[in-house]
Amino acid sequence: MLQAENIKKAYGKKTIVKGISFSLKKGESFGLLGPNGAGKSTTISMISGLVPHDSGNITVGGYVIGKETAKAKQKIGIVPQEIALYPTLTAHENLMFWGKMYGLTHGEAKKRAAEVLEYVGLTERAKDKIETFSGGMKRRINIGAALMHKPELLIMDEPTVGIDPQSRNHILETVKQLNETGMTVIYTSHYMEEVEFLCDRIGIIDQGEMIAIGTKTDLCSRLGGDTIIQLTVSGINEAFLVAIRSLAHVNDVTVHELELKIDISAAHHEKVVTSLLAEATAHHINLLSLQVQEPNLERLFLNLTGRTLRD
């Protein structure tokens, strides 16, 4: 569905995107992550044909961006981070406008607008002006506008920013359903749990480069760091600490009062937990609580991009 090969973009002397490559199969859901200023928005703008790429090749649905951009755009629906709606028009009028912008006839746009309003759960508000809508409702119509021409590739740039939990849940379920019908999705967000819920594969961009790409399971197992076991115990003695520090697959043990944080190799936590229980029994120590924190997407992201704030 999408092929991006070594695409680059510079503004003046500053290179924003430094040769990114990736491809998507039809029906795949792809999460694109990165810190602020990493090059995510520029990348999706080039893919969608809104910003010309300086070099490299982009193909969408068999059409080459830069040569057959108009045909490629017919395959693409874009949900921008900003609300791209006219506030003084009704929800139905906004959808009709976007339908005609995509080349639908009046009849086609009217039929499709009714379908889209039902899809985003706003049929009853069709005749209300956008300026009367909540932030979450505007976001849902924003998505609806991108669906008017039945795109094969849906590009979503942080579509749940600043909305209520109910609207957020509705949007996520809508995206999931669209993907299950065969629509290809590129989804950018700073909410890691959304990407984990929606996406088959994940790409992480930093400083204009794709620094990691793969499934969540693959990336976390390779790059996500250690599994952490947190213990709260009734008491601690030196012999117990020596014993657990010498266990196979234990990389580090830190102690704070009666709490222990044990970093272990991710693939072996079941063996280590069994050994910990045995050592606690042998040293007459009662375990008050035990929690296992496996590598997750947020830890992976911070491991790769660092914890320094980005403007």
UniProtKB/Swiss-Prot annotation:
GO function terms (MF aspect): ATP binding; ATP hydrolysis activity
Domain called ABC transporter: residue spans: 2-232
Induction: Induced in response to linearmycins and other polyenes via the two-component regulatory system LnrJ/LnrK.
EC number of this enzyme: 7.6.2.-
Keyword Membrane: no
Transmembrane annotation, as ranges: none
Keyword tags: ATP-binding, Nucleotide-binding, Translocase, Transport
EC class name: translocase
Keyword set includes Cell division: no
Residues that bind ATP: 34-41
Similarity section: Belongs to the ABC transporter superfamily.
PANTHER family named in the record: LINEARMYCIN RESISTANCE ATP-BINDING PROTEIN LNRL (PTHR43582:SF2)
Subunit description: The complex is composed of two ATP-binding proteins (LnrL) and two transmembrane proteins (LnrM and LnrN).
Function: Required for resistance to linearmycins, a family of antibiotic-specialized metabolites produced by some streptomycetes. Part of the ABC transporter complex LnrLMN that probably facilitates linearmycin removal from the membrane. Responsible for energy coupling to the transport system. Also mediates KinC-dependent biofilm morphology.
Protein name (database record): Linearmycin resistance ATP-binding protein LnrL
Phylogenetic classification of the source organism: Bacteria, Bacillati, Bacillota, Bacilli, Bacillales
